[in-house]
Amino acid sequence: MSKKYIVTWDMLQIYARELAQKLLPVNQWKGIIAVSRGGLIPSALLARELNIRFVDTICVSSYDHNRLRDLKILKYAAGNSSQIIIVDDLVDTGGTGKIIRNLYPKAKFVTIFAKPMGKLLVDEYIIDIPQKVWIEQPWDMGVTYQSPLVRDL
């Protein structure tokens, strides 16, 4: 993927607030399940905006910075309920989204960004992104991409 969509911290906060508005009224929600790692920061922003205190994680491994790899569930979260919001940063090819839908069919599944191959899997999202565009999230960047201190072996 040669084209990139650069997301700044400011943009992410604005988009998360827009997503939170779509999730009102808040009394319909009991908690949030973040899809780790991409959904961690959007989940924190939504939890703040909606004043939700219960936040859990499902840990899914699918990317190595910009390379898709086999999906693995590292940790499950309890909570298949229509009162739970599942949050990820994006839906891309739909691999993770299909797993989320199968595990939590009653939950509300939301993302900030959606690409064409996966967007039918989410209930709400904010920004359409073309399939061949790579999204650079602010937690992955300094001035340029910074490798994590610890990498997969």
Curated annotation (Swiss-Prot):
Family matches, as PROSITE patterns: PUR_PYR_PR_TRANSFER
Topology class, membrane: Peripheral membrane protein
Job of this protein: Purine salvage pathway enzyme that catalyzes the transfer of the ribosyl-5-phosphate group from 5-phospho-alpha-D-ribose 1-diphosphate (PRPP) to the N9 position of the 6-oxopurines guanine and xanthine to form the corresponding ribonucleotides GMP (guanosine 5'-monophosphate) and XMP (xanthosine 5'-monophosphate), with the release of PPi. To a lesser extent, also acts on hypoxanthine.
Which organism was this protein described from?
Buchnera aphidicola subsp. Baizongia pistaciae (strain Bp)
- Similarity annotation: Belongs to the purine/pyrimidine phosphoribosyltransferase family. XGPT subfamily.
The UniProt entry lists the main location of this chain as membrane
Any idea which UniProt keywords this protein has?
Answer: Cell membrane, Glycosyltransferase, Magnesium, Membrane, Metal-binding, Purine salvage, Transferase
Q: Which GO terms describe its molecular function?
A: guanine phosphoribosyltransferase activity; hypoxanthine phosphoribosyltransferase activity; magnesium ion binding; xanthine phosphoribosyltransferase activity
Asked if the keyword Membrane belongs to this entry, the reply reads: yes
Question: Gene encoding this chain?
Answer: gpt
Instruction: Cite the binding residues for Mg(2+).
Output: D89
Q: What name appears for this protein in its UniProt entry?
A: Xanthine-guanine phosphoribosyltransferase
Q: What class of enzyme is it?
A: transferase
On assembly, the entry states: Homotetramer.
Residues in a coiled coil are: none
**EC numbers:** 2.4.2.-, 2.4.2.22
Any GO BP: XMP salvage
Q: Which pathway does it take part in? A: Purine metabolism; GMP biosynthesis via salvage pathway; GMP from guanine: step 1/1; Purine metabolism; XMP biosynthesis via salvage pathway; XMP from xanthine: step 1/1
* NCBIfam families, alphabetized: PRK09177.1
Where, per UniProt, does this protein localize? Cell membrane
Chain positions recorded as 5-phospho-alpha-D-ribose 1-diphosphate binding sites: R37, G38, R69, D88, D89, L90, V91, D92, T93, G94, G95, T96
Cofactor(s) named in the record: Mg(2+)
Query: One Gene Ontology cellular component annotation?
Result: cytosol
User: Where does the chain bind guanine?
Assistant: D92, I135
Q: Where does xanthine bind?
A: D92, I135
Pfam families reported for this sequence? Pribosyltran (PF00156)
Keyword Transferase in annotation: yes
Q: Which residues bind GMP?
A: R69, D92, T93, G94, G95, T96, W134, I135
